[in-house]
Amino acid sequence: MKDNFYISTAIVYTSSKPHLGNTYDVVLADVIARYKRLRGYDVYFQTGTDEHGEKIELKARENNILPQEYVDNIASCVKDVWDSLNTSYDKFVRTTNSKHKELASKIFDKLYEKGDIYKGNYKGLYCVPCESFWTESQLVSGNCPDCGRPVKEASEECYFFKTSNYSRWLYDYIEGHPGFIEPESRKNEIINNFIKPGLQDLCVSRTTFKWGIPVSFDSNHVIYVWIDALSNYITFLGYDPCGPSSLEFKKYWPCDLHMIGKDILRFHAIYWPIILHCLGLEMPKKIFAHPWLLFSNDKMSKSKGNIVYAEDLISKYGVDAVRFYLLHDIPFGSDGNYTEELFIDSINTNLANVFGNLVNRTIGMANKYFSGKITNIKEYADVDKELVDLVLSLDSKIENDINNVRISDSLDKIMEVYRRCNKYIDETEPWVLYKENKLDRLNTVIYNLIESIRIATVFLQAYLPDTANEIFKQLNTDINTMDSVLEFGQYNSNMIGEASPLFKRIEK
């Protein structure tokens, strides 16, 4: 029986069209989902859109359309962008879905019945863009600590979730489960900035707008975003707090990995675990808060006029060029930076020079020197063994990196093999071997290159699926499974295909 693996991304808020920075976590999650499928896991990959709230109600009014029409348009746009990025999600969810609304309402009712939700009055500070409440001490220079924009005074009747009752439980759970929140620096922020000072009860309903799921027993209130949006991870699996849950829920929950942006870690690492605890459910196994993608070292925002859209880059440079930049050039644990110059440099340096050039040269030599017919001769010189050992080390290295969500590191290890192959060509000088009529040695060199490319490309399928498929086509092989990377020499003497440029250099 295959092991199950459930990975989710944060659902995208449908107040506006997604920009390049919004695509980062879904592409990261896609790599992990594809990799786990290659490993034989039964993967469930969920993503989607968060479609309720005050900001959406205001945006719809500005556009003179109903909120449902507004979110329909944005959700369709998000799905199109995710599809254009070649993401392999299993379910694209929307919180305006009728079944989700029914189950989220039941979750709210269940928490109320248990005494974990009570009615009160809120008076304090509120950020409309983030839909977050703040205390004076949490502000940064008088503004929202998440987005930096001004907050406003707010006063209204609402229902509160008794998060303050669970500070000790949450602290003990986090400390008792290393790896539950990663990276470690983010875990420390959650503990030191929020849990140790003492959690405040959380406002979980609103009365100042109507675009949301009504509270079933109090029609003046709508369920606030945190119970509505966070519950998507279980409602779309068929969790029902009042009756039998679905087989799908029993199969995949708890989630193996919540992939989210660092700006929403507070909600996933504090409120979500407490909600699950109150419902008597298991915790997700890991919550990973990834860094941001910045534009010229500044956060992307419409107000700053520095928005870049993924679909524009895809139409200009191709989907795998965009995926590569997101996956390779944003370092583990720190914010990445986008400029068009950096993007083009990465394509030229990594994809055209290292990667495309290697495949083109290798296939070209196989056809030129042996009319495309290469045989496996297992007699290795020291320089061969160094290459082979590096290639065979990929399996354990990438497994470790993927399990630790070090995606950029893992992709660079694949690139290291391609770079080493280029160096191997310089070291072995195939053109000299041909000139000196050392054809057996020449055959071995070219075979080692082909097999090294093939094995590295088996892993590449998780990162750049279209490019990987094209390489296998040019190598004329279908030996592309994970069990074929454990032993060097699986390439089976096919008549190799014709070389075709994978990536072209871009002139600035």
Roles of regions detected by a PLM:
Residues Y70-Y126:
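A broadly conserved sequence feature marking short terminus-proximal activation segments
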Residues V31, E69, N73-D80, K106, ...:
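A non-catalytic, amphipathic alpha-helix used as a structural packing/dimerization or gating element
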Residues K59-D72:
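A charged helix-plus-loop insertion that forms the helical arch/lid used to bind
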Residues M1-N4, G48, G120-L125, P129, ...:
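Basic, alpha-helical terminal appendages of large translation-related enzymes
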Residues L265, L326-D329, G333, T339-L342, ...:
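Active-site-proximal binding-pocket segments
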Residues T135, K152-E153:
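Short functional micro-motifs and their immediate structural scaffolds
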Residues M1-T47, R94, K99-L103, P129, ...:
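Structured secondary-structure scaffolds
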Residues T49-K55:
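Short, charge-patterned binding micro-sites
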